[in-house]
């Protein structure tokens, strides 16, 4: 017999198997000896009033437990109809895995390098401070998500089957605990191996990868009054043909936006967010969030999620990394961009998070003549200005949080876990005035929710500008571009996702949308 129940457990009860067994048996009205197994289905940590794990468990009473099978069901697609997937980030990879399930051969075109070489290129960036524009913290196998902590949660459950995404990660090497955590993460140190395992699955079942291959154009044919995409062309002149093209190039592939602009294909400006990355001692965040509880020894490094409104703008935390580091995330020379990541153990002494301000067309009327690329142009100019302020290097401008909020230069700065040099800068003078005002007020308002957040122990680093794409490539109800049939814009780069899980689901949905066009056996999902 099995019984599912919800139970609140103290950290000590949760992490001590005998205590958990007793608590669950008591809640279920059973004797401890009758419980053969307790399977945790869901857990979330609540530290608001005392520290408790809200837990959903399945109790096996006098019945043996059979572990879940997380394996996918992939077809041999070596000789099947092909679909071109531009980009090997989460949207592209999960589109490829889903393609194998439904009987399509995925051909993945990736501008960057496999994760093994990408790791070496990033190490080279750390030594030389020179950005490789095709292989960096954003570009390469796995996309930007490979180096962003591997957070696996999304606010929306309407996009698709989140458990399916988690199962594919577990199948390829992720800790099965991601299937139960309300705020699951994998860790940058684990993700590269998982991404490589996904590549092996895709190639073993007939998929192809073309690395160091940058798409320069779409192959478009006119069929009556309709334009239909037949494939892509790369910068070397090679062509790749398929039954459809999934465009999953990520939020930093600015050359794709320029291609669309030059061709006159439909795009639109999309609101995005821009700000700074805030860094605190992790011990301070733990004390604030866990209220100096004796149970802290059982608990993971504390996280936070903050949001407020200032002058009609949203101000919010983004990509919060407990026990993390800050990385130089520029994709070309002449840019300064920061992002955060953390490894699976989240054991750095620092916590960091983007704190960003929403930006819309109404905020930048001076760029109106740029049309769909108005916000992209604004984003570029801010990144260039910060780069110049840092001495034309990828050194990160840094300032004490309290000094930033009071519009005064810092006389000295805190230590930072930025993977590169920092330079003392008055960041309040570098960013657009409306962004600075919103950040200054928002950071102080956050102290009302997390007393101690506003402190001279914290630093701000600039600039957090790649929160999402400032451009949307539109699509209709079939997920195709309105002008270009059989082109499926998806993921963050098309403006339809924001994070690993939502991007993965968008890639899956793009493949599902192909099925009315190409006769395929339906399998699952």
Located regions from the model:
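Residues forming the flavin
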Residues: 2-53, 57-147, 151, 155-525
